[in-house]
């Protein structure tokens, strides 16, 4: 089973980015999704409401090893404690993987896959003082695609990336996950499709 978003249309608004998309399961349209770009919820409209649990479970499982931000919520319930001072005490809430995170995962994968068709997409960690949140800067190596280049050409690009950014990760669109550039460099042929005549 595979879920994906197609026919994605975006529009910049005053408060963010609005978008609409068709939701597909195994190539068959099963509903639509939208974000109105007003800072509110993301909406999911499925032809059969029972499909929502399957979509959320599939996306949670698919995101676990992806390296994307929502993966941390797929593995367990995150319990966060906020201390509001001595007088206010501590507030606790639980955050579980839900339909909004599932749609965020599908949007992120769709965007990265689209960019990776014509470029090598990679990211590097960015340190933000006094926070434990994983933050990354994402780059593209234009005109180079792991889907169309020869293994030798991709190796040269990976050497450049690892020399410039020692801890870079490259988007692997076939597996929908971030892979360490240095790890990928060890066995490029495992990550690059076999080219005719290469």
Predicted regions and their residues:
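Terminal leader/tail segments of proteins
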Residues: 1-198
């Amino acid at each position: 089973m595979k879920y994906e978003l197609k026919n994605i249309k975006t529009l910049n608004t005053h408060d963010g980015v609005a978008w609409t998309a068709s939701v597909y399961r195994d190539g068959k349209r099963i509903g639509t999704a939208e974000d109105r770009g007003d800072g509110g919820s993301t909406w999911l409209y499925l032809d059969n409401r029972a499909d929502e649990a399957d979509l959320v479970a599939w996306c949670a499982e698919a995101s676990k090893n992806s390296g994307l931000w929502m993966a941390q919520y797929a593995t367990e319930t995150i319990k966060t404690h906020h201390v509001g001072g001595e007088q206010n005490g501590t507030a606790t809430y639980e955050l579980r993987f839900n339909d909004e995170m599932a749609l965020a995962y599908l949007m992120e994968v769709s965007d990265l896959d689209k960019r990776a068709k014509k470029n090598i997409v990679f990211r590097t960690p960015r340190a933000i003082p006094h926070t434990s949140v994983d933050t990354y800067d994402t780059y593209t190596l234009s005109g180079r695609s792991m889907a169309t280049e020869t293994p030798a050409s991709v190796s040269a690009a990976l050497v450049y990336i690892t020399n410039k950014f020692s801890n870079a990760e490259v988007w692997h669109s076939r597996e929908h996950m971030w892979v360490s550039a240095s790890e990928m460099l060890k066995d490029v042929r495992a990550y690059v499709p076999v080219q005719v005549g290469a």
